[in-house]
Amino acid sequence: MATFKLVISDPKTGIAKQIEITGPEAEKLIGKRIGDQIPVKELGINLNELFGKEFPEDVKMEIRGGTDKDGFPMRPDIHGPRRVRILLSKGPGFRPKEKGERRKKTVRGNTISPEIVQVNVKLVY
């Protein structure tokens, strides 16, 4: 059974809240990709209680990224739930120290699997 830490960000206020989901709600996230949108009602999350303000009924969450059990970040350009070592020059998983620097880094694909522990989402109105 999957368990995820869900970091929900509200882009209008800049506030982010972290909750943990387990069971059938967490299973609904498996197989989703970065960029997919999920209705909040489908996961059974009460945003009004969590953020302390009113939200419209049709609010969706867009998956923006996450990390696996060993801390490797998800990248939107790597397809599937696999872990790979790739040569990076910028983007998620690598911050170059000097101009033109490239380095091999291990990153996770863009699909949520049971090995993922944290999922970052933003609210879409």
Swiss-Prot record:
Keyword vocabulary terms for this entry: Ribonucleoprotein, Ribosomal protein
Gene Ontology biological-process annotations: translation
PANTHER family per the UniProt record, alphabetical: 40S RIBOSOMAL PROTEIN S6 (PTHR11502)
Signal peptide positions on this chain: none
Cellular component aspect of the GO annotation: ribonucleoprotein complex; ribosome
InterPro entries for the chain: Ribosomal_eS6, Ribosomal_eS6_arc, Ribosomal_eS6_CS
Family: Belongs to the eukaryotic ribosomal protein eS6 family.
HAMAP family given in the database record: Ribosomal_eS6
Keyword match Calcium: no
Keyword Ribosomal protein: yes
Pfam families xref list: Ribosomal_S6e (PF01092)
Protein name: Small ribosomal subunit protein eS6
GO molecular function, one term: structural constituent of ribosome
